[in-house]
Structures are given as C-alpha cells and as structure tokens.
From Swiss-Prot:
SMART domains: G_patch
Pfam families from the UniProt entry: G-patch, RVP
Family, similarity comment: Belongs to the peptidase A2 family. HERV class-II K(HML-2) subfamily.
Post-translational modification: Autoproteolytically processed at the N-terminus. Expected C-terminal autoprocessing not detected. The sequence shown is that of the processed Pro protein.
Function: Retroviral proteases have roles in processing of the primary translation products and the maturation of the viral particle. Endogenous Pro proteins may have kept, lost or modified their original function during evolution. This endogenous protein has retained most of the characteristics of retroviral proteases.
Lipid biosynthesis is among the record's keywords: no
Enzyme class: hydrolase
Name the UniProt record assigns to this protein: Endogenous retrovirus group K member 7 Pro protein
Quaternary data: Active as a homodimer.
Species this chain originates from: Homo sapiens
Span of domain Peptidase A2: 21-96
Length: 156
C-alpha cells in the first residue's frame, strides 16, 4: 500500500478478527482507535483507564478487553488492543503502523536547485511538458550505455 500526500486523506483497510475496517493513517496517534458505531456489539470492551488526547472531547472511551489479530493493508500480521470512542472514522495509529512496517519517505529532487531555477526562468512549469504547447515529455530521459562504443578509443 502506498499513498502520496494530496488533498485526499490517506485511508487504508485492515482486517481485525476477520472483520474489515477502513481507517485514516495517523502517524500522530500513539494508539489505534475504532469508531464506537463500527465496533461489533458482541466484541468485549471495557471502560478505558486512560483518556484520549487530541481528538476533541470524548465522553465515552473504551478499550478492547482482548488483544486482537489484525491483517494490514498488504496482509501484514499484527496485533492490536484498540481504543473505542465516538469519532467519525477509524484511526490507524503508530501501534499498528510500526507493525506494518510503515515509513514516510521524501524523495530527493531529480534536478539540482540551480538547474530548477534556470528551467523556471526559461518558462518551465513543474508537472507540465516541455515545448510550445507544454505537451512534451514530462519525465527525464534515461541515459542508456551503448556497450559497443564504451570507453575512449573504441576500435574501428
């Protein structure tokens, strides 16, 4: 599973005890939280001994009485003992994200800052193609080595 940062929220599916849930990937949350209206009535829960901070005022906060088996978005095996409260959507916190091997990466730019400034001064608009109608290639051309002409002074 991969998601680019955009105006859309990063949501993914997980299967907990055989039941599918969709939740928001939340790297700022220490623990995963299931919305009270999605928690199956026959699954045991207890009043939580600790409160939740950062999600507004939650009057009823519960926690699963059991540690539950979970499959991540790419079938990663994990366990979770989620909190349960009245929130509009489920949150996948770092307790699950770490077990799933989640990582945040920021790729290095393809071009140096100097070359980017030169291209911008020449009228290049990032994401658009080169040329009069901005419909040319949008990705760098990959250099390919010609094995027959490799090195200095190749044979004639």
């Amino acid at each position: 599973w991969a998601s680019q940062v955009s105006e859309n929220r990063p949501v993914c599916k997980a299967i907990i005890q055989g039941k599918q849930f969709e939740g928001l990937v939340d790297t700022g949350a220490d623990v995963s939280i299931i919305a009270l209206n999605q928690w199956p009535k026959n699954w045991p829960k207890q009043k939580a001994v600790t409160g939740l901070v950062g999600i507004g005022t939650a009057s009823e906060v519960y926690q699963s009485t059991e540690i539950l088996h979970c499959l991540g978005p790419d079938n990663q095996e994990s366990t979770v003992q989620p909190m349960i409260t009245s929130i509009p959507l489920n949150l996948w916190g770092r307790d699950l994200l770490q077990q799933w091997g989640a990582e945040i990466t920021m790729p290095a730019p393809l071009y140096s800052p100097t070359s980017q400034k030169i291209m911008t001064k020449m009228g290049y608009i990032p994401g658009k193609g080169l040329g009069k109608n901005e419909d040319g290639i949008k990705v760098p051309v990959e250099a390919k080595i010609n094995q027959e002409r490799e090195g200095i002074g190749y044979p004639f």
